[in-house]
């Protein structure tokens, strides 16, 4: 499959765009370098987070696509899922409920490595600490169970959006968390019925990737996680390793 037709440097697409109205720290993070991929998830370059999230670069004919991940952290004792509500300071999808942690591996040493999704796993550990205060020492790369990848496109508003190949990672690592208020406005552990009730409540808003993953994958995996409790009665993400695949699901 052919790669997107990008005229380097991609940053020319952001000339003249002022970010003065946004939170200073979130603007700084927009300069992080994301990994550009084609629809087969073959990496071919890098661009700033700002460049990657502008709808003018996401829409055809530019079709800019980058690599991402979504972590689903379950409490071992009862299999409840940790949700976060994105801070209002976020530039994309502010104030929305989503899965435990969603972000991007960066084009830096250690996170570009693809074997066994090691770069994505390292990025997940880094962002769990940044967003939720979970020490990286408690979430080593092998603590995550990789399940699949999805390819989706979703606008946030007229200016910003997402176009990602998103790696889905489950974890049942026992841990405490403290939300970074610049990233997270609320957290909540929910059971499967509680999450289903949240989806039915129109007063709640959810990120598009979380809704897509829940619709097509999450609840089936969750059922399996609960059904495969260990001898202590605890859930273990490692029990789902046989459900992983090498596909990229176009959503």
From Swiss-Prot:
It is an enzyme of class 5 (isomerase). Pathway: Isoprenoid biosynthesis; dimethylallyl diphosphate biosynthesis; dimethylallyl diphosphate from isopentenyl diphosphate: step 1/1. Transmembrane segments: none annotated. One of its GO terms (molecular function) is isopentenyl-diphosphate delta-isomerase activity. It catalyses: isopentenyl diphosphate = dimethylallyl diphosphate. GO terms for cellular component: cytoplasm. Pfam families: NUDIX (PF00293). Its EC number is 5.3.3.2. Its cofactor is Mg(2+). Keywords: Cytoplasm, Isomerase, Isoprene biosynthesis, Lipid biosynthesis, Lipid metabolism, Magnesium, Metal-binding, Steroid biosynthesis, Steroid metabolism, Sterol biosynthesis, Sterol metabolism. Mg(2+) binds at residues 53, 66, 162, 164. This is Isopentenyl-diphosphate delta-isomerase. It comes from Phaffia rhodozyma (Yeast). The gene is IDI.
């Amino acid at each position: 499959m052919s790669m997107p037709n990008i005229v380097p440097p991609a940053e020319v697409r952001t000339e003249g765009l002022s970010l003065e109205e946004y939170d200073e720290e979130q603007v700084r993070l927009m300069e992080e370098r994301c990994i550009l991929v084609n629809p087969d998830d073959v990496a071919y370059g890098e661009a700033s987070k700002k460049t990657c999230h502008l709808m003018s670069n996401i829409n055809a004919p530019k079709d800019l696509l980058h690599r991402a991940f979504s972590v689903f952290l379950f409490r071992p004792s009862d299999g409840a899922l940790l949700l976060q509500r994105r801070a209002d300071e976020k530039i994309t999808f502010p104030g929305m409920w989503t899965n435990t942690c969603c972000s991007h591996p960066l084009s830096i040493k250690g996170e570009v490595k693809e074997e066994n999704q090691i770069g994505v796993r390292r990025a997940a550990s880094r962002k769990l600490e940044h967003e939720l205060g979970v020490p990286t020492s408690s979430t080593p790369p092998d603590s995550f169970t990789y399940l699949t990848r999805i390819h989706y496109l979703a606008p946030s508003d007229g200016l910003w959006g997402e176009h990602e190949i998103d790696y889905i990672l489950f974890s049942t690592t026992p841990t405490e968390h403290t939300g970074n208020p610049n990233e997270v406005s609320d957290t909540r552990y929910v059971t499967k019925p509680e999450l289903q009730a949240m989806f039915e409540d129109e007063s709640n808003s959810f990120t598009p990737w979380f809704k897509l993953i829940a619709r097509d994958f999450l609840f089936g995996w969750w059922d399996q996680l609960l059904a495969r409790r260990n001898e202590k009665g605890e859930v273990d993400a490692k029990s789902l390793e046989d459900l992983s695949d090498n596909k990229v699901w176009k959503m």
